[in-house]
Amino acid sequence: MEVVLKPILQNIVRKHGYKIFFQKKFSVVESLKGRVPASLANRKTDFIIASNKKFVNIEVNYYAGPGSKPEEIVDSYINRKKELEANGWSFIWITDGNVWKTSKNQLIKAFNELECIFNLEFVRRGLLSEALLRILA
């Protein structure tokens, strides 16, 4: 799914003058004077978008079928969001796939805890771009 989103994010970044980091460790933003939680510094992220010392972690996942992974990811991303927000970051999760038709409780849990969750259709309609404009303004 990163392959699908990378060109979309590159267009948003180019249009608004943001910086993008793809498949980098969180510590990459230390060069931009960003605060990085110690527990995340050496972890890789799908995307980081940066502008004016504001940072957004974007994680993307596609799940074709049921399993324990989507449940673990929801809990993990809720915890990550809290840790990032404590350090001045924002968090966006882009997820899609048939698993969410049968894992509605986990999806509801995610919507109750995470402000920015999008599927591919929402991204294509421009909601990700709007969210980034609001967050990075």
Per-segment meaning from a language model:
Residues 47-51, 56-64, 77:
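Conserved catalytic cores of phosphodiester-cleaving nucleases, focusing on short active-site segments
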Residues 94-137:
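Domain-level recognition of nuclease-like catalytic cores that cleave nucleotide substrates
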Residues 1-33:
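Acidic-basic catalytic patches of nuclease active cores, encompassing PD-(D/E)XK
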Residues 14-18, 84-90, 112-118:
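Structural alpha-beta junctions
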Residues 62-105:
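Catalytic cores of nucleic-acid endonucleases
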